[in-house]
Amino acid sequence: MKVRASVKKLCRNCKIVKREGVVRVLCSDPKHKQRQG
């Protein structure tokens, strides 16, 4: 899980999800998981 100021899709499988006010990126590739912090 990477914590970043700006989250971006890294591939076409990445999805941007807003969960409880936190922007997250979910992907089939675990290396692409991100959270905005």
UniProtKB/Swiss-Prot annotation:
GO molecular function: structural constituent of ribosome
Any one of the GO BP annotations: translation
Pfam families: Ribosomal_L36
Cellular compartments per GO CC: cytoplasm; ribonucleoprotein complex; ribosome
SUPFAM superfamilies (UniProt xref): Ribosomal protein L36
Domain of life: Bacteria
Keywords associated with the record: Ribonucleoprotein, Ribosomal protein
Coiled coil: none
InterPro entries per the UniProt record, alphabetical: Ribosomal_bL36 (IPR000473), Ribosomal_bL36_sp (IPR035977)
Family according to the record: Belongs to the bacterial ribosomal protein bL36 family.
NCBIfam families the record matches: rpmJ_bact (TIGR01022)
The protein's name: Large ribosomal subunit protein bL36
Species this protein is from: Pasteurella multocida (strain Pm70)
Gene: rpmJ
